[in-house]
Amino acid sequence: MKVELTAIEARVIGCLIEKEVTTPDQYPLSLNALTNACNQKSNREPVMSLSEADVLYAVDALIERRLVSDESGFNSRVSKYQHRFCNTEFGDLKLTKQEKGIVCCMLLRGAQTPGEIRTRTNRLATFNDVKEVENVLEHLANDEKGPLVVKLPREAGKRESRYMHLFCGEVDVSELAVATTAPSSAGSERITQLEQEVAELREELAALKEQVESLFS
């Protein structure tokens, strides 16, 4: 696998993939909308506090590598960005909808168990059960062009092993262990889902405000 991203680049790509699926009417994203998505408090781990300059620096680097493109029109005053990370005409990385959903979820939240991935990808892809998630993960881990994810050693007291993407290079297991938080309950997962929905509604409102302002500018 040739793609290697910084943490901010991974967040940018993850956000663009997510919004392409969940809010297609607002996609491609303006720099403001993309920055808001990167700093979203729900469905992000770790939570970041990036400036527009931070995000633009990452976007410019990704454009140079043809992983992001500026889709704004000739007379447009606002740049709009879309990812070219996978499933492009000339790109090497081809992912199914399920694979894309899993990769997106990992780019946004890091290492996760198959059960967590199934819950958190409910708006990105459909899985019948956890076993189906595990099968897709195994396929990604054994990709013929090089592994895209890796299965991590099972932690003491945990029933499931976590998986992590390899788009930011090899995984430092000891670092991940330090960053591990307490397991989520079903109630906290529901709260996370509600927080995500509120954040997305705010983004849609911000995008509508942008459109109105552009009409009167």
From Swiss-Prot:
InterPro entries: DUF480, WH-like_DNA-bd_sf, WH_DNA-bd_sf. PANTHER family: UPF0502 PROTEIN YCEH. Belongs to the UPF0502 family. This is UPF0502 protein VIBHAR_05349. It comes from Vibrio campbellii (strain ATCC BAA-1116).
